[in-house]
Amino acid sequence: IILKVTVTDGDGDIAQQSVTVNTVAVPLFEGAPSGGSSVVTTDEGNIPGMGSGTETPATQPFGAATDGSFRMQLHGADATVTIGGTELKVENGKLYHNGVEVTADAAVSVPGGAHGTLTVTGMDADGTVHYTYTLTTPVDATGNASNRPGEGDAGRGEAVRADAFDVSITTTGGTATGQITVDALDDAPVLSTLDTTQTTVADGEAALTGTLSFTPGADAEGAQVTVEVEGQTFTGTKANGEWTFTGGSDGSSFQLNGTAFTYTRPASNTTDGRNDTIILKVTVTDGDGDIAQQS
């Protein structure tokens, strides 16, 4: 901007000066769906080897990995872009890391994720930066600050905060800040099969057999399985891939071999001469409190 001032007196004498002001545009961070944050969603239930793999209408569109982007308005300027502590450079409209242009084939991994990995995969000519986030570990949904604080488990498909990466964009005109935030859809246990091979058990017959199949889902750490039958509660403990159930103070027992279960009734119930209705109730509770239950 050139500001030119001219003073002319009554008989035509002139005094004149000019001042030049250079303008520098301030950068802007534009996230989606909100301007201050680029928000993406992943699904805990689809973490390979951990998740339950079950889907609901809320979880169907999402996987363990997701793509996202944010846009920088640089007004043609070069810039330093810092994502989660990793420094990138914009020079002549291209994005670089340590002198190498960032592309899908030369992506940059951003360390520091609490539950997954963030990878920057490139930049478009309009300043849109693309990234991929992959969820690798489950997120404890109990009392999560971003999801109903203090209300316990979130339930299958409820969103909880998994990660956040601060973004700063610096040019000669100033600094803009934003954030990449990642939500994870909570997994839940699945009790897929509970069935018996007998519809009746004769008085004097001790064993009740059947099939029990379940998975605690991604939040398997700290998961609990209980079996309630004829006034007794059996609690399961997993070791070396197998579940062992303890309980039965009346001499009864519950065993699970793979998916085949055997409930051994106490002698007091097999010889009482009465018709009994046996209700077998199984409850699977995952590490952050989600429940699957069948009888």
Stretch-by-stretch model annotation:
Residues I1-S295:
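Acidic/polar, solvent-exposed loop/turn segments
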